[in-house]
Amino acid sequence: DRSVSRGLGDVYKRQQEFSSDLGSRAVNRINNVRTMRGLQFAEDASPMAHPIRPDMVIEMNNFYTLTVYEKGAEVIRMIHTLLGEENFQKGMQLYFERHDGSAATCDDFVQAMEDASNVDLSHFRRWYSQSGTPVVTVKDDYNPETEQYTLTISQRTPATPDQAEKQPLHIPFAIELYDNEGKVIPLQKGGHPVNSVLNVTQAEQTFVFDNVYFQPVPALLCEFSAPVKLEYKWSDQQLTFLMRHARNDFSRWDAAQSLLATYIKLNVA
């Protein structure tokens, strides 16, 4: 399967990971995201939209697309995010033990990851069969009396020429919350720590965090944890704050891009 062989070999491991270790991980990640947002998202929105694993192709050239290669690599990256480094490496070892030298498929790859980690990826498999770019909308609310911060996250994928009906995907949505001094607020619920990668699997979900002692500034979709379009009503103050305080280099860059885009639109209008 080309998405596995090229997405894993050429793009994920060699380009993304090797280039990151050799040079700047942040710069390499930013370049990858630029490719996704500038080119692959456009392909998803075009008459040529197709899933990573097409049901049928007319000729071999149909395999050489940004969706198959670049989006395929992002999907592998999401699996790494969901499983963690140790389980991902176990999955890689099992995958090569089973399929080295054979014509393995996307399903073979995901199955190896599931078997090695004991993590259910059945819902996640939709990334391979559903075309289009998901749009994730985030709304938040803070209650100073209860010190609770609420995120309401919804997802939708616009219809594409090849698929009119869309289903919710399993989206790993990485976040961080910052207090007024730029310190990270630990994520907690019911006295227990909460993973900073939220598992968004439904059309709409609500996440409530306890012991948030200050109106937080959220960093959303940290490291571009999923190839989605993010909708959130940022204020200029929030974006400026993230440019100064976000621990994640990508989040600082992304905040700067969003702020710049806001002022460009104001001047054009």
Residue ranges and their predicted role:
Residues 56, 153-155, 177-179, 232, ...:
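Active-site proximal loops enriched in glycine and acidic residues that flank catalytic Cys/His/Asp
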Residues 5, 91-95, 163-171, 189-190, ...:
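Composition- and surface-driven signal marking solvent-exposed, interaction-prone regions
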Residues 82, 130, 157, 260-262:
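A very general structural signal that marks isolated residues within well-ordered alpha-helical segments
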Residues 120-123, 131-220:
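Beta-strand-rich binding/interaction modules
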Residues 37-38, 42, 65, 210-269:
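Long, ordered, helix-rich scaffold segments
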Residues 63-66, 79-82, 96-100, 115, ...:
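Generic amphipathic alpha-helical segments used as scaffolds and interaction surfaces in large
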